[in-house]
Amino acid sequence: IGMVVECKDGYLVGNDGCKYSCSTRPGHYCASECSRVKGKDGYCYAWLACYCYNMPNWAPIWNSATNRCRGRK
């Protein structure tokens, strides 16, 4: 029996709509944060923000079209 599981990749965002910053965090920070929302793996992209792989569809990711970080669009 086959099962289709939808996953997505992207920048992890917090409740404020902002990307998770990683510039001053330890190397494993992003991988830990991504796995916390059931992502497969993650890394600190250009030492600025956490990028996650294979996250479930319910996990919030940053989108430039709907960016609401600190009330901005």
Swiss-Prot record:
Give the tissue specificity.
Expressed by the venom gland.
Disulfide-bonded cysteines: 18-69, 22-44, 30-50, 34-52
Task: List the signal peptide residues.
Answer: 1-7
GO function terms (MF aspect): sodium channel inhibitor activity; toxin activity
Would the keyword Secreted turn up in this protein's UniProt record?
yes
Q: Pfam families this protein is in?
A: Toxin_3
State the superkingdom. Answer: Eukaryota
Q: Which PROSITE patterns match?
A: LCN_CSAB
What GO cellular component is one of the record's annotations?
extracellular region
Q: Which residues carry this modification: Arginine amide?
A: 70
InterPro entries, alphabetized: LCN-type_CS_alpha_beta_dom, Scorpion_toxin-like, Scorpion_toxin-like_sf, Scorpion_toxinL, Scorpion_toxinL/defensin
Ordered alphabetically, the record's keywords are:
Amidation, Disulfide bond, Ion channel impairing toxin, Neurotoxin, Secreted, Signal, Toxin, Voltage-gated sodium channel impairing toxin
Q: Where would you find this protein in the cell?
A: Secreted
Which residue intervals define the domain LCN-type CS-alpha/beta in the entry?
8-70
An additional note in the Swiss-Prot or TrEMBL entry is:
Negative results: does not affect the cardiac Nav1.5/SCN5A, the peripheral nerve channel Nav1.7/SCN9A, and the voltage-dependent potassium channel Kv1.5/KCNA5.
Q: Which family does the UniProt entry place this protein in?
A: Belongs to the long (4 C-C) scorpion toxin superfamily. Sodium channel inhibitor family. Beta subfamily.
Question: What this chain does, per the record?
Answer: Beta toxins bind voltage-independently at site-4 of sodium channels (Nav) and shift the voltage of activation toward more negative potentials thereby affecting sodium channel activation and promoting spontaneous and repetitive firing.
**Anything noted about its domains?**
Has the structural arrangement of an alpha-helix connected to antiparallel beta-sheets by disulfide bonds (CS-alpha/beta).
User: What protein name does the entry list?
Assistant: Toxin Td5
The organism is: Tityus discrepans (Venezuelan scorpion)
